[in-house]
Amino acid sequence: MRLTKYGVFHVKQTSSCDVVVIGAGHAGCEAAAAAARFGARTVLLTQRLETIGEMSCNPAIGGLAKGQLVREIDAMDGLMGRVIDRAGIQFRILNRSKGAAVQGPRAQADRKLYRLAMRAALDETENLSLLEGSAEDLVITDGRVAGVVLADGSTIACGAVVITTGTFLRGLIHLGEKTWPAGRVGDAPSLGLSLALERAGLPLGRLKTGTPARLDGRTIHWDSLDRQEGDDPPVPFSYLTERITTPQVACGITATTPETHAIIRANLERAPMYSGQIQSTGPRYCPSIEDKVVRFADRERHQIFLEPEGLDDHTVYPNGISTSLPEDVQLAMIATIPGLEQCRVIRPGYAIEYDFVDPRALHRSLETKGVGGLFLAGQINGTTGYEEAAGQGLMAGLNAARRCAGSAPLVLDRADAYLGVMIDDLVSLGTSEPYRMFTSRAEYRLLLRADNADSRLTPKGREAGCVDSERWAAFMVKAAGLERGRALLQSLKGSPDWLRRQGLEINRDGVVRSAWDLLAYPELGLQALAAVWPELDSLSGAVAEQLEIEGRYAGYLDRQEADIRAYRREEGLALSADLDYDAIGSLSNEVRQKLKAARPETLAAAARIPGVTPAAVTALLGHVKKMVLDWAEGPVP
């Protein structure tokens, strides 16, 4: 066992710190860095230091809604955006032809570069130490976590623990009829922590995920395949990255065939998901290829993206054919795919089952309701995806550090960020399948865009203590540019006749319009307006992009701001954790049971529980208001 910066822990020795983070995947790295940025003495515990920041499944960051999460993590001074900017080998803005609210940045990553860049970022973080070892138990005293017991018998005393174990909790790999315990291929599972969580009274369940085979790119017939190039120039994730310097590569595109599907159908009884070997639920929106063939029986082809895993790595990730079929079936199946007829399989795909905690057992701070100082983040909360995990990790790590300092947690709501939407969904509704983020989950997505995440969150992060001076200074420069740009756009005005003489087709209604007003016209952007007012050429880069979006959607944004004010009135009405729902006579038994199970923290959270009717919300509101009134009036003398 090694501990950087603190020296070496000896067996049976007890050491101490403020926050211990268990697991160094995407959630753990962000949790540890956030706690350390706040100033907490933090230890990041992992079985193997060389796997810190490992991309266990696909070699990509971002995507629809996920890209917004990465921008939000970056706005809070998290690591993921800067790390992918250093390791990305293909950048694309998805849904570029659609509105700004549903666009999403995505990047292919060089796995090794990503891992090295994450390790370097952690090594540069003050107050953070990296420890190689395995957590086996928790020390819980008087309902509060007090330390972590390691496999060698040593103990780390601490004020808070963040568990970010991914798929390691009682992980079980399935490859056809074969099964073996593992956290992922090559790593042992975590058994003791599952038992510790059960002893602490946390409700555990099982979920499943999977990954495809890995291919040798030197044996792929690339010339016969379509190519997918990245954007040129590539758009960075981090607000601090000026430009991408890593060499860029293309991906290949192919598809399954009827012959592929015939092989899969002929071997379904050997597929763990269909033989009854796997009982857990997998991710609905990332199904295995055997699931696709069964659920979409009329489809003759399913698209596959062949994604290089690195600049100096011949491994290719075939995105779209995740499977746990036996290895011989996988080999036969892959040989029927165009371009892969002679392809060598480096490693077969597999499925993995693992424990998770029902996230309804958490506060919105991601602290468990039953054990003070114990925080959970990532797949342990029922989510899937690097970005979802990283976002939870940042919030859990920051709030763990704030708890140690005696400060109130930072809680983001549904109008603040996709981070707030995700956490609210989890703790209010729970999940019976791996949860992933979508733009459709966010009611206020027009405001929760990728371009303005810093405007929304960097001031909150600065106030909460997780944004450093370098990022704050850069943010203030951009904020000043936005303020000057808005003032300039609103100051430049013209009548319809004058604007028509400048070549702009405007209704002759006599209304004088500003350049800001004209941005609402779909055909008019800053470039067109700069031909009329050359001083607008001074606006460029991220400032120009954000101003153009704000101007275009100004009317819609105003209406959404009004919706948010109404939402926050409900969100501001807190519900007591010991509220007696049996005392509200007008509630049905079904609604009463749902409210008791979820114990929502606010009226708005109660309204989002499936089956809780508007009438029930009204009854709940009336009951709470009566309680407040009775309390204010006090006993009659």
Swiss-Prot record:
Main location group: cytoplasm
Matching InterPro entries: FAD/NAD-bd_sf, GIDA_C_N, MnmG, MnmG-rel, MnmG-rel_CS, MnmG_C, MnmG_C_subdom, MnmG_C_subdom_sf
Cofactor annotation: FAD
Cited SUPFAM superfamilies: FAD/NAD(P)-binding domain
Residues holding FAD: G23, A24, G25, H26, A27, G28
GO molecular function: flavin adenine dinucleotide binding
Record Pfam families: GIDA, GIDA_C_1st, SAM_GIDA_C
Ranges that cross the membrane: none
Record bears the keyword 4Fe-4S: no
Residues engaged in binding NAD(+): 282-296
Keywords annotated in UniProt: Cytoplasm, FAD, Flavoprotein, NAD, tRNA processing
Keyword Flavoprotein found: yes
Family: Belongs to the MnmG family.
Purpose: NAD-binding protein involved in the addition of a carboxymethylaminomethyl (cmnm) group at the wobble position (U34) of certain tRNAs, forming tRNA-cmnm(5)s(2)U34.
Protein name, entry field: tRNA uridine 5-carboxymethylaminomethyl modification enzyme MnmG
